[in-house]
Amino acid sequence: MLDVVPWSAVLSQHFGLEVSSGSTRGLLLRLAALLHDVAKPQTKAIDDSGRMRFLGHAKAGAAITANILERLRFSGKEIKLVETMVRHHLRPGQMSDNELPSHRAIYRYFRDTGGAGIDVLFLSLADHLATRGRHLNLAEWQKHGKMVEYVLAQHFERESLVIPLKLVDGHDLINIFGMSPGPRIGEILEAVREAQAAGELTSREEAISYIRERLATEEVVY
């Protein structure tokens, strides 16, 4: 069963890294596994079909986890890592339906999970096993493992998915397109990074054309 879980020397090194105070990523992953569903009692609800739901338990659990670890005098780095794992533990299963996740989805995943992206993937595997228990569907488990393996491969082999090279910056948007400083510039630059991760943009010229078309479309819609 565990042969489905991807593993390598690089991953072993990752989970052996010390975060602070002697605690490693592997240790904090275990702590996140212990706490990831801590908010289920507070968020429990029964829907119209009679099915039990725990809407918002990941977000609520992250806040509870942070509070618990603060009271236990964990360091800021430790708290941030564990809180992030708890907050996003459902995210890997939401990246795609029946197919492997797109490059755009993988980029967004690592953007949102920050330095905890790898850790969250393994928490999702542990959660899958714990949730199904003896009712585990082997085909679904293998599918989950394949997805995690694919996302990890893209992460390690395609650095541009995690940190795309800068093709344009805020000064370009101001000088070329006459935009005013503000949040809109950040939104446009993030859209460019996503398009890069998806393989749609590979050069500065393509990025400028992409922005020009996007702004023109927005003007028409407006």
Predicted regions: what is each one?
Residues M1-L125, L136, Y222:
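Conserved, hydrophobic alpha-helical core segments of structured domains
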Residues N67-R71, T131-Y222:
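Charged substrate- and nucleic-acid-binding regions of tRNA-handling and nucleotidyl-transfer enzymes
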Residues L121-A130, D172:
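A basic, often C-terminal nucleic-acid-binding module that engages the phosphate backbone, implemented
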